[in-house]
Amino acid sequence: MRLIAENLTLERGGRRLFADLSFTADAGEALVVTGPNGAGKSSLLRGLAGFLAFATGGVRLEGGATQASLQEQTHYLGHADALKSALTAAENLGFWAGMLGGGAADVAPALARLGLPHVADFPVRALSAGQKRRVALARLIVALRPLWLLDEPTTALDVGAQALFAGVMRAHLETGGIIVAATHAPLGLEGAKSVKLEGAPLGVGEAA
């Protein structure tokens, strides 16, 4: 499986964020998008997810499910946690499991992998910011999708939770998944490729 982006140009509000951006990510690879605020990191992810239209270029996933669209094979996690505050953690994940093609049996294991089995029956409004973020991250594993698009996924996470999520990401890569993540902070993914956005022609290379 391979994610291929070719000659991507994105404009917003009359401003060109980037132009002629091309990259690939193979099964088992992570691609980390870096750059200053306003360089277009979030917009790139939203374009890959199909929420924004690129002015030029295209994106495709080769070797995935032949009858499914790119979006149907993608998990997108943005800045917002996308949780209902009145519902419990388990109820929120149950909703997303149904929406994304998972099942109710996947909810408890997903919470456990993020260190949250004890909050399953707590309303989300009673959780801390870090716990809410972990519930949102658990959405990635209640339904199997090969491509993960993650925008600042470790926001509000403490060191321990960051380590837990790094393990989740590594497990996804080990099973042949692909991750594209925009971040200002290290994600604990050794050997990840990098794309640096600067609001001008970009470079793609290996992360240090």
Model region roles, listed by residue range:
Residues W148-E152:
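Catalytic Walker B motif of ABC-type/P-loop ATPase nucleotide-binding domains
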Residues A104-A120:
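Conserved ABC ATPase "signature" region
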Residues A49:
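Helix-to-loop junction immediately C-terminal to a conserved catalytic motif
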Residues P123-G130:
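Conserved ABC ATPase signature
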Residues A80, S85-G101:
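Q-loop/switch helix immediately C-terminal to the Walker
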Residues M1-A27, V32, T56:
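A short, flexible loop at the N-terminus of ABC-type nucleotide-binding domains that lies
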Residues L137, G176:
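Hydrophobic anchor residue at the start of the ABC signature
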